Amino acid sequence: MIWYLREVSGMFRFMLFGFLFSSLVLLGSIPDIDYDYFENDKFDLVDIDEFLGRVNVKNILRGRYFFIGIRNVANPSAVQALSKEKLDEIREINPVGIILFRENFKDAQQTKELIEEIKRHLGSDILIAVDEEGGLVSRASENKKLGVYNFPAMESVGKTGDFQLAYKIGEILGKQLRRLGINVNMAPVADAKFATNNPLGSRTFGSSSYNIGLMVEAFIDGIQREGVFAVVKHFPGLGGTKVDTHKDLALLPYSKNFLMVNNFIPFLFGKKAKFIMLGHVLVPKISADVSSMSKDIVDIIRHNLNIFSIIMTDAYDMGAIVNNFSLEHAIKKSLNSGIDIVLIPEGFKKLNVEE
């Protein structure tokens, strides 16, 4: 049993969690769905240590290096059910996983059928991911027909100081995502926010590295207990930046020692996450390369912090990459630095990444 479950003050936690759900109901955030569609809760609870040990890095990767998206914002129906030709095209890419976006979702049954078709064609071990952080970045729960609770932004959860609440949110999300066939959640955000006008906004648990670490650890334990892998992000931390990496490259003008104290602690707490995501940030006092292409950053993760999660990049269709590098160069640089997976939501088939 996870240690902090033994230290819960039962009535207080119950009241606090009940208050959260009451607030969500009043705000209309809990989706109106047909729960009869879902099977009863008959899947086994998963022992986290046994589960993560059994599903090891080599079994996940098997020589595959790319996580890709199947996108069509202008015509969502085109990516809510896939033709054999499209599936064959994806199979030629041989991705380790598929990340789904809002246009891939119509309702719960369609989503489950889409994922089952992907697995039939690409293999049952293909990873299926979504960004479900809570708050603004909630690709699944923003569709009320999917049966995923639309939790508030993690900043509000962090303010409660209640890491058992973070555990419960992770647990519920894990159960609901797994019912759909999703087995990876690109969360939690482990960045400690300390820069003025930081673009992360309410996505992070707050500014205290230690408190964020407790929240991150709890969320990861909760979601992975239900058989959904967590992705702790965005190492080395975006909380000290002032540029949104969706738009351009961010800068962290701090020393390694400063970041060890202010940025890295939450990632140490989150080391049980199956994946760790690198942000598109330049840290000139550590490396001349962008973090998502940097061997120096990989070495810090592996050798200084002793984190052995699978290392993946943030999305390579973001402004930080496309405005500054060719995708072919960025991908080769990342893989040569020791990064395990490159995330490419759009545009993969246009690339030539062969050596």
Write out the residue ranges for each language-model feature:
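Glycine-rich, aromatic-flanked loop segments that form ligand/cofactor-binding clefts
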Residues: H121-Y149, I169-A192, I212, I220-P236
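Classical Sec-dependent N-terminal signal peptides that target proteins to the secretory pathway
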Residues: E7, F12-S29
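N-terminal hydrophobic targeting/anchoring segments and the immediately downstream early-domain regions
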Residues: I30-I128, E132-K144
